[in-house]
């Protein structure tokens, strides 16, 4: 039986991250990922270093960083440092960039930029020398500590990025929602690319960011899942993204998000774009409801061969920031105790 890793995405929050990481580990999660989006949430690297001190087995990483707001050497240095501090528990979740780029007025990275960034990051965190336009560049301090190479997990929404992730990533995580047909489509793209390149299936961990809110009250779960559903639908409809491959339920909303997404309220329940996200879409695109429903819906996805799932959950507390994260972890308790053990 395939051993599935279960992770959770939580924004880092000073004064809370270390304690919540310990709670997350005790709940049975395998991975904690913190977004690297400087205008919307505190710095993940310093907070994850603190989390490394309160945990022993929990894998720690970014969910996600990007190729445009930090130079690759800077990101590699931070990750390799965390790798040494955590005794080799680091995962670098990375995508093309979205809110992190938008809030400083720059474009998100292209798939080609992301590929180059990933390859250079892998080289830096192996202690290798990287050619930076004719300048030999390496982490000179690396030899004295020699931390293990950092696992790079590429977040992918469209077909081009999925194929690139299969080519160069250590892991690939689909960000396509939780509807079975969306995961099946993404998995088919990844498996086809594996066949084309001859890369062994067992050399790549394939997973997904899963929009999931477990709550005895299904309507409450749907309400809490609306923000995540709108955000991930926006990923499918990013500027200039192809829409032809999307199913009808998603295509019209993704097209709306290309011009109607409220980036000022990204990842917030107050986003004006959420008025365009009906209950029926949330229920299809996310897993929202009591434990029995969550187990059934998640089983469908795992039966497709996913090796890991990262929960994108909801919080019943909007602010302040730390209390919001604490409430999100508490909201995940039912999922951790009544759903995850079913798959162990």
Language-model-derived ranges and their functions:
Residues 4-10, 32-34, 60-63, 90-94, ...:
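Hydrophobic faces of well-ordered beta-strands that scaffold small-molecule active sites
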Residues 45-65, 69, 124, 330-344:
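Alpha-helix-loop-beta-strand connector modules within alpha/beta enzyme cores
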Residues 1-62, 150:
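N-terminal beta1-alpha1-beta2 module of alpha/beta enzyme domains
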Residues 28, 51, 82, 121, ...:
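Conserved, mostly hydrophobic/aromatic
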Residues 3-15, 65-72, 146-157, 212-215, ...:
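Active-site mouth loops of central-metabolism enzymes
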Residues 31-54, 66, 98-101, 176-180, ...:
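Glycine-rich, proline-tolerant flexible connector loops at the mouths of alpha/beta enzymes
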Residues 107-143, 183-303:
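An alpha-helical appendage that flanks or caps ligand/catalytic pockets
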Residues 13-24, 78, 156-164, 291-300:
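Short, acidic/polar
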